[in-house]
Amino acid sequence: MRRPMVAGNWKMHGTRASVVELTQGLGNMSLPSGVEVAVFPPSLFVTQVIDGLEGKGINVGAQNSAVQPEQGALTGEVAPSQLAEVGCKYVLVGHSERRQIIGESDEVLNQKFAAAQKSGLTPVLCIGETLAEREAGETLKVVGRQLSSVIDAFGIKAFANAVIAYEPVWAIGTGLTASPQQAQDVHAAIRKQLAAMDAEVAANVQLLYGGSVKAANAAELFGMPDIDGGLIGGASLNADEFGAICRAAGN
């Protein structure tokens, strides 16, 4: 049975003081049993958060890592092996802000996906369509292509050690969110695409929904059969709100 997961993407938010406060708040949360909880702070604060959450049952991930697994001459980047050494468990790959603003291609993201796995990290592959693509009826085509890029490069078994997060680009940071049924329809299509190649991988991979998830709508979203939790943005910056979302996943 798939374990529910709630992941908090802090994006480029936080100061030393606010990260201490948020980490302490998270550490004091009463977490539901059986829910995997992880947070993704800016890389500058990763070790601080790992130390602050030691023994609290919350994993830490990175928002980005380099295309090569090992350290080397790549100015400004962080190797996934370095992240693994300091205690990270996960790394985000392919978030829409990196696809669209930074311009990361499928080829680059595939390199990052493979480097993360080689270093012992679990990649969280982010996929999703823009508003124009949804209005054109191309949601499943776009999401399917983004999935196929990884499958074509590494095979379906690559998703035996990965998490998939469906984040419609039009719902990220906008206050808009897909309806539970809209989200479920896409999640079901993702699982069906995987199942056509490997039923066991499809049945076991965690599929998260992201896009303006809040405590108020989390329970309804997480109640859908193919939605295994959420990748949370703004709401993860408030320990009480994030805790409420985690409890919704536990129910």
UniProtKB/Swiss-Prot annotation:
One of its GO terms (biological process) is gluconeogenesis. PROSITE patterns: TIM_1, TIM_2. It comes from the Bacteria. Keywords: Cytoplasm, Gluconeogenesis, Glycolysis, Isomerase. It is found in: Cytoplasm. Its EC number is 5.3.1.1. GO terms for molecular function: triose-phosphate isomerase activity. Belongs to the triosephosphate isomerase family. PANTHER family: TRIOSEPHOSPHATE ISOMERASE. Pathway: Carbohydrate biosynthesis; gluconeogenesis; Carbohydrate degradation; glycolysis; D-glyceraldehyde 3-phosphate from glycerone phosphate: step 1/1. HAMAP family: TIM_B (MF_00147_B). SUPFAM superfamilies: Triosephosphate isomerase (TIM). Homodimer. This is Triosephosphate isomerase. Substrate binds at N9, W10, K11, G173, S212, G233, G234. One of its GO terms (cellular component) is cytosol. Involved in the gluconeogenesis. Catalyzes stereospecifically the conversion of dihydroxyacetone phosphate (DHAP) to D-glyceraldehyde-3-phosphate (G3P). Pfam families: TIM (PF00121). Disulfide bonds: none annotated. The active site is at H95, E167. It is an enzyme of class 5 (isomerase).
